[in-house]
Amino acid sequence: HLDIEEFLELRKNTGDDRRRTHDMNTANWVPDLFMKRVVEGGEWTLFSPADVPDLHDKFGKAFEAAYISYEKKVADGELTLFKKVPALQLWRKMLSMLFETGHPWITFKDPCNVRSPQQHVGVVHSSNLCTEITLNTNEREIAVCNLGSVNLVEHLVDGKLDHAKLKRTISTAGLRRKNAQVHA
């Protein structure tokens, strides 16, 4: 994305507060091609999403082929809104911001999609906050990860687990989670 460098700084504590989002959780969705360019010491071309709308829904070889074709359009003068940056420099900035602010998280787009058990649903575009659960989304559906926990100590009676109480708690928690999804 053409604005990645500004995006990386959204959680910084310094600078113009109008350009900060202190409460927003942000992430970088990194394709394998970018990492290849980092390793090779190559350049990364930043595009406007309006000029490359299909990249969002591609991964792996399909993403790589489309991305390289857009770079050819830049070279041929067909695309004029772009910026080339050293991939390693951009990677270092991503890591610096992650270390400094805890954001944006880094998640790898291609492995998430290649290993997705839900490829029939479409391309994975995001994950939950901890990035261990991938979420399928599209123009009509937004995915949300609802988390919950059970305090097992509260289910002990004379040092033994009260299975009936635990079953009721889990059932109630499951219904509340389901209701939260339906009414959201």
Describe these PLM feature segments.
Residues 105, 146-149, 167-183:
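Long, well-ordered alpha-helical segments
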Residues 2-163:
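Active-site cavity-forming subdomains of large catalytic enzyme subunits
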